[in-house]
Amino acid sequence: MKSDIEISHQAPLLPIQDIAKKINVDQDDIEFYGKYKAKFSQSIWSKITSKKQGKLVLVTSINPTPAGEGKTTVTVGLGQALNQLGKSAIIALREPSLGPCFGLKGGAAGGGYSQVVPMEDLNLHFTGDFHAITSANNLLAAMLDNSLYQGNPLNINPKKIIFKRCMDMNDRALRHLVIGLGGDKDGVVREDSFVITVASEIMSILCLAKDINDLKQRLARIIVAYNYEGEPVSAEDLNAVGAMATLLKDALNPNLVQTLENTPAIIHGGPFANIAHGCNSLRATKLALQLADITVTEAGFGADLGAEKFFDIKCRIGDLQPDCAVLVVTTKALKYNGGLGKTQWDHENLTALATGIENLGKHIENLKKYGVPVIVTVNAYVTDSAKEHEFIAQYCQQRGCRFAISQVWEKGGAGGIELANQVIDTLENDAPQFQLLYPDNMPLKQKIETIAQEIYGAKGVTYNANAQEMLTKIEDMGFGHFPICMAKTQYSLSDDPALLGRPTDFTINIREVYVSAGAGFVVSLTGTINTMPGLPKKPAAMAMDVDDHGAIKGLF
């Protein structure tokens, strides 16, 4: 089997204006970024408002192995399969972050014969959206520190500054630092830290903003610090909103590319799901829904993180109505959740599978709580056994759940026909009864406990003193109606990454709480999760290079 990058290099790509034609978009309504990439122009929105909205399919997964479950691969393959069956389908995905690309993943645009292309562009700089987000974020940080230096007219308490600089890279050395060192002309000395761009509030704001006016209103609400009286200081107070919006003007528009089989793909935004809300932009999803009969999108990591936030944050804020959920599982992840180490995943082991499959059962239960029909699909590997697939199929049937084998990594769209037919049948015959997990007016603490108990299966929640105090303060500030964005490990239903399968009798520990007033949610940090990842011992970057002809090697 060829590598992903070799497959992508050999793919016959269509000019991007031809991809636009497939979804009835005139080339006057796209801005070209070379031959194979484009941004939708602002002019597109007035032309699609009268179109009937299509169906929305969410792809999610069980708790993954460190290598992931292949949600993006299945999303791409499903979109290709739907188009092969004559359906008008668009896939809507997040843009990959440079951090994981150079860290563990080595790229994130699907895999095998189900990829979004051009693969190198997508993984490296793409259309510059992340650069714009990083720049807007760091402009606000610079204006904040400049206000401190220029006499501190807003009476900001340097020990109560909460807005962080960001960079789209895994760099643990930036988690704790001191800035302003030098002399009197070098700024005010204080402790600071960086977050990765995809965990920044501005990334979430871009992904939840409905239009440029909504973007500016959200930017204005960002709380950067508290003054000596304990009152919040906002980006609006710093007069930074106009300049930030200027940097983000083009980044607000979704991007158009294609898959290996020339299926249209809208790529926009990229918040992490373990430390942010984990979904592509609301504008991209709404655009896709107006342009195609079926939109296939994904939410990051397992359904306990990405899907919960997709429903309770993105669908709540964007008034979206999902029509079904595809739950991706691999035999490897089931055996991993059943206690087997990496070297044993490729061997048939029905005992470990039977233990680990309880993780799948919990995710099926969780998705049904939202009232959406569920289709389980095995992202098949050549090392899987027929007995393993049969065991999973029977488990799903016993729970009244549709099931399909997916071979889209190996066969592209042709390997997703079984899944696509299940999706089509579901959309035509199984009416969703979508509902949110909790109402807006539920107290914040109760929202956290509802997620912990209903979705994770925890017996309770503990809070440290600072988190407890902050929850009260946030409600007093008028943000008690916001949804919760849980920051939690992706590897377990609990906040302990080593607690696999379907754990019971555990407690979720809340160590920090803060409000993202611009994004419109309250972040609750659990366990040891942090907002600036580090590189592994052998980063994927060590295997990357570019040859004399400009061809990139080493992206997976």
Curated annotation (Swiss-Prot):
Positions bound to ATP: 65-72
Pathway where this protein functions: One-carbon metabolism; tetrahydrofolate interconversion
Tagged with keyword Nucleotide-binding: yes
EC number assigned by the record: 6.3.4.3
One of the GO BP terms on file: tetrahydrofolate interconversion
InterPro entries with a match to the protein in the record: Formate_THF_ligase, Formate_THF_ligase_CS, P-loop_NTPase
Gene3D superfamilies xrefs: Domain 2, N(10)-formyltetrahydrofolate synthetase, Formyltetrahydrofolate synthetase, domain 3, P-loop containing nucleotide triphosphate hydrolases
Reaction equation(s) it catalyzes: (6S)-5,6,7,8-tetrahydrofolate + formate + ATP = (6R)-10-formyltetrahydrofolate + ADP + phosphate
Superkingdom per UniProt: Bacteria
Pfam family membership, one: FTHFS
Keyword Hydrolase: no
Sorted UniProt keywords: ATP-binding, Ligase, Nucleotide-binding, One-carbon metabolism
GO MF entries: ATP binding; formate-tetrahydrofolate ligase activity
NCBIfam families with a match to the protein in the record: PRK13505.1
Family the entry assigns: Belongs to the formate--tetrahydrofolate ligase family.
The protein's name in its UniProt record: Formate--tetrahydrofolate ligase
Organism: Proteus mirabilis (strain HI4320)
